[in-house]
Amino acid sequence: MVDKLTHLKQLEAESIHIIREVAAEFDNPVMLYSIGKDSAVMLHLARKAFFPGKLPFPVMHVDTRWKFQEMYKFRDKMVEELGLDLITHINPDGVAQNINPFTHGSAKHTDIMKTEGLKQALDKHGFDAAFGGARRDEEKSRAKERVYSFRDSKHRWDPKNQRPELWNVYNGKVNKGESIRVFPLSNWTELDIWQYIYLEGIPIVPLYFAAEREVIEKNGTLIMIDDERILEHLSDEDKARIVKKKVRFRTLGCYPLTGAVESEAESLTDIIQEMLLTRTSERQGRVIDHDGAGSMEDKKRQGYF
């Protein structure tokens, strides 16, 4: 009797197949590691794909300098425990200009520290393929993106100039100067991610679990007081509005641009139960997604992941 693969095992097999295909087809791939839950799952799948050997490519974190402190601690812990070959890149031009989300706004901060920083790192190391943990259920521009997302010599995405992927056959031929972004988790949902984390025992950043945290409401978004830098940009009136609430994060990014949600979910089973009932997008708390209609697609056309 042949055992049928479960839904999650089918997704796992598909993702591992994609990761192995890229490793075989491309000369110099890299796996982006943003420290979030999707990156954790993607890294776990990559380690499975090449077990018992080591990853045949490095992992890279494009650092904006504004991630949550717990994310940095978690990143360093994973690098040490797993023996990862980690590349960290910070846009030196952004550092020189002291680009930050308060003074320069979310759009400029994201463009310089994330998009331009990523493009710099890819060019510097000559990577021809970059894995990312984006999923189609996250956002409408990602919903129409291929697993192999082709980029031109300036890393720009043209949604009208992509290749068909019939029967899970991926064409990895690129012209000189071109590269691809690869999304092994394209067909996963947020619920799939959490169920897989639970079943596989994958470690994640504690910020995903509900706890009492200091927050301030800004334009309807609960922003966590993660370090003293945010206090420099708050008025005395704003500081008086800082309160403690039981919150967690469904998605993680730069902390001044990432909203928390009120929640009682303190465990993986609690989170899964919450996911079964929720009807809102996990990216509702991402300030950068509200920069304007079609803002994510515009960012991707310029080279954003």
From Swiss-Prot:
Tell me which PANTHER family the record gives.
Answer: SULFATE ADENYLYLTRANSFERASE SUBUNIT 2 (PTHR43196:SF1)
**SUPFAM superfamilies referenced in this protein's UniProt entry, alphabetically:** Adenine nucleotide alpha hydrolases-like (SSF52402)
What pathway annotation does it carry?
Answer: Sulfur metabolism; hydrogen sulfide biosynthesis; sulfite from sulfate: step 1/3
Species source reads Pseudomonas fluorescens (strain Pf0-1)
Which protein are we looking at? Sulfate adenylyltransferase subunit 2
Gene Ontology MF annotations: ATP binding; sulfate adenylyltransferase (ATP) activity
The subunit structure is: Heterodimer composed of CysD, the smaller subunit, and CysN.
Keywords for this protein: ATP-binding, Nucleotide-binding, Nucleotidyltransferase, Transferase
Would you kindly state one Gene Ontology biological process term found in this protein's UniProt entry?
A: sulfate assimilation
Kindly give the HAMAP family that the UniProt entry links to this protein: Sulf_adenylyltr_sub2
Q: Which family does it belong to?
A: Belongs to the PAPS reductase family. CysD subfamily.
